[in-house]
Curated annotation (Swiss-Prot):
Sites where the protein binds heme: R62, R102, F151, R344, Y348, R355
Disruption phenotype: Impaired catalase activity in leaves. Accumulation of hydrogen peroxide (H(2)O(2)) in leaves, which consequently promotes nitric oxide (NO) production via the activation of nitrate reductase, thus leading to subsequent NO-mediated leaf cell death, as well as increased S-nitrosylation of specific proteins including glyceraldehyde 3-phosphate dehydrogenase and thioredoxin. Leaf bleaching and cell death; these phenotypes are reversed by melatonin treatment. Increased tolerance to zinc oxide nanoparticles (ZnO NPs).
Induction: Abundance in leaves follows a light-dependent rhythm with an oscillating expression pattern peaking early in the light period. Inhibited by water stress and abscisic acid (ABA) in a concentration-dependent manner. Enhanced by ABA biosynthesis inhibitors nordihydroguaiaretic acid and tungstate under water stress. Slightly affected by high salinity and hydrogen peroxide (H(2)O(2)) treatments. Accumulates upon infection by the bacterial blight agent X.oryzae pv. Oryzae (Xoo) strain PXO99. Repressed by cadmium (Cd).
Record note on quaternary structure: Homotetramer. Interacts with GLO1 and GLO4; these interactions are disturbed by alpha-hydroxy-2-pyridinemethanesulfonic acid (HPMS) and salicylic acid (SA). Interacts with STRK1 at the plasma membrane.
Subcellular location: Peroxisome; Glyoxysome; Cell membrane
Main location: other
Reaction equations catalysed: 2 H2O2 = O2 + 2 H2O
Main EC class the enzyme belongs to: oxidoreductase
Identification of the protein by name: Catalase isozyme C
Gene Ontology biological-process entries: cell redox homeostasis; circadian rhythm; hydrogen peroxide biosynthetic process; hydrogen peroxide catabolic process; intracellular nitric oxide homeostasis; protein nitrosylation; response to abscisic acid; response to bacterium
Modification(s) after translation: Activated by STRK1-mediated phosphorylation at Tyr-210 upon salt and oxidative stress.
Source organism per UniProt: Oryza sativa subsp. japonica
Role according to the record: Occurs in almost all aerobically respiring organisms and serves to protect cells from the toxic effects of hydrogen peroxide. Responsible for the redox homeostasis in leaves. Prevents nitric oxide (NO) accumulation and subsequent NO-mediated leaf cell death as well as the S-nitrosylation of specific proteins (e.g. glyceraldehyde 3-phosphate dehydrogenase and thioredoxin) by degrading H(2)O(2). Involved in photorespiration. Promotes drought stress tolerance and recovery. Involved in NO-mediated enhanced tolerance to zinc oxide nanoparticles (ZnO NPs)-induced phytotoxicity.
Enzyme Commission designation: 1.11.1.6
Length: 492
C-alpha cells in the first residue's frame, strides 16, 4: 500500500515566481507605487494577496497538546493475536502498516519549553487497509479524572489564571482537592518521570480501556502500552532548568536529528486483556481510567513494534494540521464504556472541526490511504474532486453498497438513567503502592515537589489539610512526612 498515493497533486515547485492562481510575478521585492516615492496602489494584486495570506497563516492552536512534534514510520506485527481481534492490520506476524506519530506536551502553549513538568501526548495514526485507526494516548498509563464531564474544568485549572495568565498551584490543588482519584496520576506527574528527557525515551499508553473483538464476536477489554527499546530517561528538576534554558525545543530537535542521522526510534507494543465476564474479580473497575491493571495478575502480551524512520516534510501540514480522534477505529477494535473515553469520542473530532474545518479528514495526513466512499459532501475547504450524479443512498444508479458486516461487542445493557460515581472508587491503594515501590531518595524528591506545591501562599489551610488527608490514606508515612515538613516552614 502506497501511503502517498492519494496526496493532492500540485505544481508549486515551478522555477518561476507566481501568484496563488498561477499568474507570473516579475517583481517580488517592490510594491506598485505612483512614481518611485508615491503611494502604494491597491491594484497591486500580488501585494494584497501576499499580505492577506500572511495575515491568515496561523490557525487556532490546540486547546491542549498545542506543543508537539511528529514523525512517520511503520508498525510491524511480531506476535499473533488473531484469537483476540479480527483487525486486518494485525492479521499475521510480519504485516507492516504505515503510521504517523505526534508527541506533545499537554497544558502549555505552542511555543512553550519542552522541559516543563507536564504529561506528554503519544498519538499514533495507523493507515490500515480498512481505514485509519487513531490510538490517542499519553506517556502515563492513568489520568487525573474518570468522567469527561470534568474535563473542561480540569483543563481550566491546569491552564494559566485567566486574570494574570500565570499557571498557579493554588488553582490546581484547589480543583483536584475535590477529586481524590487524581492521586494516582500525581504519583506519575510529580515523580522523577514527570519530565521526560525527550520523546524517544518515554513510554506510551492508550490510557483508556478499549475492546478487542475476534471473528467469533468474543470481546476482551484491552489496554495498550508502548515501551521504547532505548529505555526510559527523564530529567530531574535542575537538569530540566539547564536543558530548557539552553534549547526550549530540545525534544523536537532530538527527534528530528536522530531520525535524520539514521538512529530510528523504536517502541514495542504490548497489550493487557481482561475478559468482561471476569471484571468483578478485581478490587478496581477495569473501565476506571485512574487505575492501572497490575501486571502480576494481568500480564503484558507482546504484539508488535513501531519504528519511526522518516521525518515529516512540512511542520504545518503534518503536525499542526495532523488531527487525531479516539472515535476513529477499525473493525476488530472497539470502544468500551470507560466514561472518559466516551466523551473523548465526541470532543476530539469536534475540536478538530473547529480548529481545521469540517473537511479536516480530507487533509493529506488525516485522509485514509485506502479507497473510501460516502455521501459526505461540500462544506468549507472541500478540495475532493468528485463527479457523481447520485449523492444519496440507496440508489439503483450507484453500485456502491454496504461493506460486509463485522463483529462488535454484543453485551446487553440495562439500567436507569442516572448521574453517579462508579461503585469501586478505591482511590488510595494504587497511589500508595506506587509510592512504596520507590527507593528513599526517589520518595524524598517526590515529597519535595509536593512541599513546593503545597507552599503556595494562596493555598488555604483547609485545602492543605485535605491533601495531607489524601496522602495519609495512600501511605501513612508519606502523610506524616508532608505534614512535618510543611509545619517546619516559616510561612506555614
Amino acid at each position: 500500500m502506497d501511503p502517498y498515493k492519494h496526496r493532492p497533486s500540485s505544481s508549486f515547485n515551478g522555477p518561476l515566481w507566481s501568484t496563488n492562481s498561477g499568474a507570473p510575478v516579475w517583481n517580488n521585492n517592490n510594491s506598485l507605487t505612483v512614481g518611485s516615492r508615491g503611494p502604494i496602489l491597491l491594484e497591486d494584486y500580488h501585494l494584497v494577496e501576499k499580505l492577506a495570506n500572511f495575515d491568515r497563516e496561523r490557525i487556532p492552536e490546540r486547546v491542549v497538546h498545542a506543543r508537539g512534534a511528529s514523525a512517520k514510520g511503520f508498525f510491524e506485527v511480531t506476535h499473533d493475536i488473531t484469537h483476540l481481534t479480527c483487525a486486518d492490520f494485525l492479521r499475521a506476524p510480519g504485516v507492516q502498516t504505515p503510521v504517523i506519530v505526534r508527541f506533545s506536551t499537554v497544558i502549555h502553549e505552542r511555543g512553550s519549553p519542552e522541559t516543563l513538568r507536564d504529561p506528554r501526548g503519544f498519538a499514533i495514526k495507523f493507515y490500515t487497509r480498512e481505514g485509519n485507526w487513531d490510538l490517542v494516548g499519553n506517556n502515563f498509563p492513568v489520568f487525573f479524572i474518570r468522567d469527561g464531564m470534568k474535563f473542561p474544568d480540569m483543563v481550566h485549572s491546569l491552564k494559566p489564571n485567566p486574570k494574570s495568565h500565570v499557571q498557579e498551584n493554588w488553582r490546581i490543588l484547589d480543583f483536584f482537592s475535590h477529586h481524590p482519584e487524581s492521586l494516582h496520576m500525581f504519583t506519575f506527574l510529580f515523580d522523577d518521570i514527570g519530565i521526560p528527557a525527550d520523546y524517544r525515551h518515554m513510554d506510551g499508553s492508550g490510557v483508556n480501556t478499549y475492546t478487542l473483538v475476534n471473528r467469533a464476536g468474543k470481546s476482551h477489554y484491552v489496554k495498550f502500552h508502548w515501551k521504547p527499546t532505548c529505555g526510559v530517561k527523564s530529567l530531574l528538576d535542575d537538569e530540566a532548568v539547564t536543558v530548557g534554558g539552553t534549547n526550549h525545543s530540545h525534544a523536537t530537535q532530538d527527534l528530528y536529528d536522530s531520525i535524520a542521522a539514521g538512529n530510528f526510534p523504536e517502541w514495542k507494543l504490548f497489550i493487557q486483556t481482561i475478559d468482561p465476564d471476569h471484571e468483578d474479580r478485581f478490587d478496581f473497575d477495569p473501565l476506571d481510567v485512574t487505575k492501572t491493571w497490575p501486571e502480576d495478575i494481568v500480564p503484558l502480551q507482546p504484539v508488535g513494534r513501531m519504528v519511526l524512520n522518516r521525518n515529516i516534510d512540512n511542520f504545518f501540514s503534518e503536525n499542526e494540521q495532523l488531527a487525531f480522534c479516539p472515535g476513529i477505529i477499525v473493525p476488530g477494535i472497539y470502544y468500551s464504556d470507560d466514561k472518559l473515553l466516551q466523551t473523548r469520542i465526541f470532543s476530539y473530532s469536534d475540536t478538530q472541526r473547529h480548529r481545521l474545518g469540517p473537511n479536516y479528514l480530507l487533509l493529506p495526513p488525516n485522509a485514509p490511504k485506502c479507497a473510501h466512499h460516502n455521501n459526505h459532501y461540500d462544506g468549507f475547504m472541500n478540495f475532493m474532486h468528485r463527479d457523481e450524479e447520485v449523492d444519496y443512498f440507496p440508489s439503483r444508479y450507484d453500485p456502491a453498497k454496504h461493506a460486509p458486516r463485522y463483529p462488535i461487542p454484543s453485551a446487553t445493557l440495562t439500567g436507569r438513567r442516572e448521574k453517579v460515581v462508579i461503585a469501586k472508587e478505591n482511590n488510595f491503594k494504587q497511589p500508595g503502592e506506587r509510592y512504596r515501590s520507590w527507593d528513599p531518595a526517589r520518595q524524598d524528591r517526590f515529597i519535595k515537589r509536593w512541599i513546593d506545591a503545597l507552599s503556595d501562599p494562596r493555598l488555604t489551610h483547609e485545602i492543605r489539610s485535605i491533601w495531607l488527608s489524601y496522602w495519609s490514606q495512600a501511605d501513612r508515612s508519606l502523610g506524616q512526612k508532608l505534614a512535618s515538613r510543611l509545619s517546619a516552614k516559616p510561612s506555614m
